């Protein structure tokens, strides 16, 4: 056979269809674009759905791809069998209203028998029961043996997914047996035994089905084919499973080397080897597509795969984190086809390392608890772990439910999944209840949520900061009312408003509401569940009635500051992507008049030099004095234009796109300045982590940034005055003083040790004989732990057959140290047990070895009682 290596097979396929006038497209991201029905791309045609449905025009009517895919529906079988996997590459060629059966059938035969040189006598074809057209083309346009063609029913050879485009398919199979099927029943039997395996599926999309068995011919027919690259490699390399083909075998061998085991010698070991081999491929490709480990969605899938692989590595005896280096094999073998793997190599390795280290930290603790629970189950002859116990492992140690299930299954046990989900639901309810408020600014929230759906409230504040409106509804406390008077705190709903309601992280506007008979302050603006804009108003004077005309005026100075901060978050978002990478996505924001807060996905703390670069980029955009334009367009048009958005959110068909020149382009309904220069200055004041994989930046702009800089300048001036140096010399002066302080502290410590050593004779003279052991106890003051340990060593060396316990009170706390020589230990003395009891009396804890132990306490007034207890404890221990 001409081609056998996996990479060569991929190239041969794509080149073949390029020769048939197909446009070769690079693999799409594993993250579906504009398709909420999928968590991850799981088929070759999945990214091409818009072309098949007519929503988008394909770049060409003939396309060929090799699409990376991840499927986790069979994850529990991965490793258990040798044919299941989560990651695979799907070769495909597609026609959008161009060629059909007459062309693709002979092309498929040409590729398999001509290019790949597969023996024709080993190839079998299945067609749909009634597809005479396909049969005709197979028998007239190829030289396939007619006795190798079998007609099968709908479940085998008709592609249909609910209502919509569908059609028959023809599949090409390869025989790995000398048995020759003479009828369709025997063919199916051999297929079920994996003696004949499917290689290529050609789908003929020619009908529009209603999902009830009724079909109409489509005006335009399509071709959708799929051939798994790994399965093709199994055939071409004459292997028994995907784990034996070149690319996967390289990974598997590397894992075996790390664990010092061989594949094929032990079934349990083989399972772990296969799981790691498969999962590292999914992990590597998912991270390269900017998926981050998390507890939700596709991030959870990644975390689950990574933790499952890490646990099986530990099962194999691999002590240290290894997945971050194992991905090198994937990148080396697949890098020629997926160039972004090499480009993102360091990033991929770093994300894996951080996540694996984090999991290994908790794995030991969690496994200890789970092993204890397993032991209890077995002792009690029980088979099911309580859901509450499983949830505690998830909540405390980050054990995914699936991981706990898998470990239990290894022990022939199971998890009460209903109980687990019940605990999860109750925790979410508690969190939701904690977030709820029944009252806001004196108004019952439930009352606000039932404001009539007939009332229309329109926001008209992008261009206006004041306008005339009609009062439609008034709410005073829990009650709807027809009027409010001076002193009332109430909700006012008008037919139109210039006030922006809190949304998308931007706080609501404030201002005034008035007419000839009434004056009030608008303290806040929000939306209720029904989307009505509601003003929280403090009535200052007069009376306001339903139906009154009022003037609404926004506090424009405050709004301008909000606009500065909101536009700055857009510039910050773009700068973070540029500096940290395309994996950065907005995870939340808060935009007020005096500051901004921006949450984003990132796997580690942002380095100081990275923060400085981000800040510099934002200020460069500000100083460029770039116009900020807002445009309303169709959602799809906005996406196609490259506008950034949180596309998991629900958007209307018409959206606003805010564009700051070449610096930023985002979908946004908030208010913005019309020129970046109006931001004035941007200053980051903090950066920290708020959750695993999520960071937060807080910043100020405009006058607040000026104030912040001024405060720091005054502080530097004050510090330089105290240090009697220039501001430039502050760090030098502080380094000098820090060095001097450390030297003085060292001198003090040495002096304390000398003074303590002077008491050595007094300490030794406190010795008492307890059942043949010399027990020494003594209380000191202001001696640190290191010095106390040194004194214990001196006493031990001077007093034979001894156990010594010394305490020292420092700053209201107690340090304890105990030591025993070999002779005392041989008689039963145990420092760890002695010090544990003594520390308990002192309100602390600790422990250690028989010959040495340390502890701490917080009750210095109990030192005398603790020392007295030592004699009793030793007496119980000595043989």
UniProtKB/Swiss-Prot annotation:
It is found in: Cytoplasm. One of its GO terms (biological process) is alanyl-tRNA aminoacylation. Pfam families: DHHA1, tRNA-synt_2c, tRNA_SAD. Keywords: Aminoacyl-tRNA synthetase, ATP-binding, Cytoplasm, Ligase, Metal-binding, Nucleotide-binding, Protein biosynthesis, RNA-binding, tRNA-binding, Zinc. SUPFAM superfamilies: Class II aaRS and biotin synthetases (SSF55681), Putative anticodon-binding domain of alanyl-tRNA synthetase (AlaRS) (SSF101353), ThrRS/AlaRS common domain (SSF55186), Translation proteins (SSF50447). The keyword Nucleotide-binding applies. It comes from the Bacteria. It catalyses: tRNA(Ala) + L-alanine + ATP = L-alanyl-tRNA(Ala) + AMP + diphosphate. Its cofactor is Zn(2+). CDD domains: AlaRS_core. GO terms for cellular component: cytosol. Zn(2+) binds at residues 566, 570, 668, 672. One of its GO terms (molecular function) is tRNA binding. It is an enzyme of class 6 (ligase). PANTHER family: ALANINE--TRNA LIGASE, CYTOPLASMIC (PTHR11777:SF9), ALANYL-TRNA SYNTHETASE (PTHR11777). Catalyzes the attachment of alanine to tRNA(Ala) in a two-step reaction: alanine is first activated by ATP to form Ala-AMP and then transferred to the acceptor end of tRNA(Ala). Also edits incorrectly charged Ser-tRNA(Ala) and Gly-tRNA(Ala) via its editing domain. HAMAP family: Ala_tRNA_synth_B. NCBIfam families: alaS. Belongs to the class-II aminoacyl-tRNA synthetase family. This is Alanine--tRNA ligase. It comes from Clostridium botulinum (strain Alaska E43 / Type E3).
